A protein has these predicted regions:
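N-terminal, motif-rich segments that launch catalysis or mediate targeting to/interaction with membranes
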Residues: 21-132, 139-229
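Bacterial Sec-dependent N-terminal signal peptides
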Residues: 1-24
Length: 229
């Protein structure tokens, strides 16, 4: 299971949608899952099929959002994001006792690596990991607590009122008018060299990549600004 866990830690980095209030939105998360599915090795496919009872990665990619309204799973809500000031670092900033996106991903990986974990636990944490890796590459999930990751920044998207988080979450993706399978089919194929480069990264590396994109957004976006592409 270690190789399977590590696969999910790098494959999401270069997906189409890694440039979401629910994360990437349903279409974005499904597209991410569909793209990841293309790069599965035979062994990984076999292991995932066992855990997901034949369902695809895209099929379960929104699981972590779907359980948000269930009080039984409220403790996992803080795992969808991580916030700290731009002038600080993740390592130096005080950590929330409730956890964050980095804690969530690491926890999921540890469960998948644990040979003593039950299938039920592995299935749950695999579904969560699939979703969280999508969140990790949505810049506003590595944002500012003061405005709730851009949810409180009002902007206009093609002259219609919305907020910055929603634009990145779903508006831009929905504007293409494509299904998640069409988005995945039009994604550039990764070369072996690109995959090797991605594998060298860490969760923290990828988090800071998204953080830089988030910084750029805050430097260029003004409240009530009209956005388009």
């Amino acid at each position: 299971m270690k190789k399977l866990s590590m696969f999910f830690l790098f494959i999401f980095l270069n997906s189409y949608v890694s440039y979401s209030s629910d994360d990437w939105g349903k279409t974005g998360h499904r597209a991410t899952g569909e793209i990841a599915q293309k790069y599965l090795s035979r062994k990984a496919k076999k292991e995932i099929n066992k855990l997901l009872d034949g369902h695809s990665i895209a099929y379960v990619s929104n699981f972590a959002d779907e359980i948000k309204s269930d009080k039984k799973y409220r403790e996992y809500n803080p795992w969808h994001y991580v916030n700290f000031p731009f002038e600080s670092t993740y390592e130096k900033h005080p950590k929330s006792k409730k956890g964050d996106l980095i804690v969530g991903i690491n926890t999921c990986v540890e469960v998948l690596k644990n040979q003593s974990a039950s299938k039920e636990d592995k299935v749950f944490h695999l579904k969560m990991l699939i979703h969280f890796m999508g969140d990790l590459h949505q810049p506003l999930h590595i944002g500012m607590a003061e405005d709730r990751g851009g949810n409180d920044i009002e902007v206009k998207w093609f002259n219609k009122g919305t907020n910055l988080h929603t634009v990145w979450d779903s508006k831009m993706i929905d504007t293409f008018g494509m299904t998640y399978t069409e988005i995945a089919a039009n994604e550039k194929e990764l070369t072996k060299e690109e995959l090797k480069t991605i594998q060298k990264g860490t969760i923290i590396d990828w988090m800071y990549d998204s953080r830089e994109l988030c910084k750029n957004l805050y430097e260029t976006i003004e409240p009530e600004k009209k956005l388009r592409y």
